[in-house]
Amino acid sequence: MLLAKISVVVLLLAIDGTSSSESTDNVVLSSSPDSQKAATSRHKRAPGWGKRSSLNDEDLFADSDSAQELLDSVAALKRAPGWGKRFSGLMSEGSSLEAKRAPGWGKRGQEIDVDEDGSEQEKRAPGWGKRAPGWGKRAPGWGKRAPGWGKRAPGWGKRAPGWGKRSGGDYCETLEKMVDAYIYKAVEVDSRRLADCGSGEGTNEPFRK
């Protein structure tokens, strides 16, 4: 029984010794230059990644005797011409920071008047706001009606000569014809009465003449 316990302890010590030796070998391998190169190769980025320029600070500031040379060296680090800049060209002595636009851009006039009280007035271009000569004038005779407009043609409203007038002879003849027609009608009616009713007494025969 005691022998079995001793053999188990020896076996555990042997296993512990082999594991510690493997860990030390791993540490040695990881500290070697070859292992470091293998580790860094797995995390390599594209060439030039994270670099702002191809020049080092030592190359940039070495042998720079003047500010102009420093500016020239900075110019080598810039991006494509005009990239992200509102004006072309680098800032140098006497250069303007204001972006240059086309001449007269955004200006309504060419000059500005300064009054005695110090207020400024914009001068507009000559003739600005003036309408062309004759603007708003209507053509000569506009709104006038043609001569004789509204007048009726000569003789309008006149009836033919003798219209509505009756001649004396025709009128009298017409009346005579009407009387004859009434008399004829009366005689015809009276003869029918005599035939149907006979001659009665007390009639107004004397008036029938």
Swiss-Prot record:
The modification Tryptophan amide is found at residues 49, 83, 105, 128, 135, 142, 149, 156, 163. Disulfide bonds join 172-197. Residues 1-20 form the signal peptide. It is found in: Secreted. Homodimer; disulfide-linked. May function as a peptide transmitter. This is Cerebral peptide 1.
